[in-house]
Amino acid sequence: MAPAGRPGAKKGILERLESGEVVIGDGSFLITLEKRGYVKAGLWTPEAVIEHPDAVRQLHMEFLRAGSNVMQTFTFSASEDNMESKWEDVNAAACDLAREVAGKGDALVAGGICQTSIYKYQKDEARIKKLFRQQLEVFAWKNVDFLIAEYFEHVEEAVWAVEVLKESDRPVAVTMCIGPEGDMHDITPGECAVRLVKAGASIVGVNCRFGPDTSLKTMELMKEGLEWAGLKAHLMVQPLGFHAPDCGKEGFVDLPEYPFGLESRVATRWDIQKYAREAYNLGVRYIGGCCGFEPYHIRAIAEELAPERGFLPPASEKHGSWGSGLDMHTKPWIRARARREYWENLLPASGRPFCPSLSKPDF
């Protein structure tokens, strides 16, 4: 199957999803740019769009080449409560970078907001909605294609975000950073999905905090909740690029390896192909990743779902399906690995003789 660029007028996000098309999101920005030296851990704010625009542009380009057809603005935690006077310039610059790269392929631009830093301490609906509305005004000015409210651990705040984003004429997606146990107020994933759709979201799901397997379990519960309530919405999943089956209700942030010792937990490209297929079989059509999800992980989604999409991404020009490029290797035992069965059944070692398989969460 040859790579293709899909020329022509771009369809909107809902038009794509309603036709059954697979939409591939992007992946990790904060964790990846921290590793590359452009984001400060702890603050996790996106000044890099102004201070190091080439680094952000390059990462967008890598995701586009890997198969992403959504360029999400790098505006995580870019609200006034986190960035004070810099918030407006950061949001505007992030939109410009995402639009520039999206224009090089069949990609849409999504303006992204996330949970605020003040909800846990002061549930001031008017103040929180004002913060969301400020970012929305920039997204409208920059004419993003649709909107994403992501990384919400409380459904009440996520509903407030959806209500604000619905003030625009753009489609709204919302993802919560919850596992099968539900949000931090013990509201089930199914009930969370119902409340979000009733608030006006067209696309619902989960992102971050949990690995692919756990995130798909949560998606199944969301889907069941919507079906039981007689509601319809498109489903979206963007998990970690890490394995974290041992984390607690708060997700990987409670693991002792977070954030600087997660490398031994990185999912392989083959893990991600399995995740992509399982997500598709569950009925999810917006499939991407979050923290730890590198461009090669996105390529794995695009390759696994190439039969459904009808084309491969440009990055597949240098990548043989299921290791097929290894059949040219000079060593016979490496040539023997040029097959799906080998990689699909491999249980990778960590190389650390005293490394435990699982950790005990700190919280």
Curated annotation (Swiss-Prot):
The record's GO molecular-function terms, alphabetically, read: S-methylmethionine-homocysteine S-methyltransferase activity; zinc ion binding
Q: Which GO terms describe its biological process?
A: L-methionine salvage; methylation; S-adenosylmethionine metabolic process; S-methylmethionine metabolic process
Q: What is its EC number?
A: 2.1.1.10
Q: In which tissues is it expressed?
A: Expressed in liver and kidney and at reduced levels in the brain, heart, and skeletal muscle.
Question: Where does the record place the Hcy-binding domain?
Answer: 11-305
Positions bound to Zn(2+): C208, C290, C291
**Is Transferase a UniProt keyword of this protein?**
yes
Q: What is catalysed by this protein? A: S-methyl-L-methionine + L-homocysteine = 2 L-methionine + H(+)
Gene3D superfamilies according to UniProt: Homocysteine-binding-like domain (3.20.20.330)
Keyword Ion transport found: no
Q: In which pathway does it act?
A: Amino-acid biosynthesis; L-methionine biosynthesis via de novo pathway; L-methionine from L-homocysteine (BhmT route): step 1/1
Cofactor comment? Binds 1 zinc ion per subunit.
User: Keywords assigned by UniProt?
Assistant: Metal-binding, Methyltransferase, Phosphoprotein, Transferase, Zinc
Q: Which residues carry this modification: Phosphoserine?
A: S321
* InterPro entries named among the record's database cross-references: Betaine-hCys_S-MeTrfase_BHMT, BHMT, HCY_dom, HCY_dom_sf
Which Gene Ontology cellular component annotation is one that this UniProt entry carries?
Answer: extracellular exosome
- Cofactor list: Zn(2+)
Top-level division of the source organism's lineage: Eukaryota
Q: What does this protein do?
A: Involved in the regulation of homocysteine metabolism. Converts homocysteine to methionine using S-methylmethionine (SMM) as a methyl donor.
Subunit text: Homotetramer. May interact with PRNP.
Under PANTHER family, the record lists: BETAINE--HOMOCYSTEINE S-METHYLTRANSFERASE 1, S-METHYLMETHIONINE--HOMOCYSTEINE S-METHYLTRANSFERASE BHMT2
Q: What is this protein called?
A: S-methylmethionine--homocysteine S-methyltransferase BHMT2
**Which organism does this record belong to?**
Homo sapiens
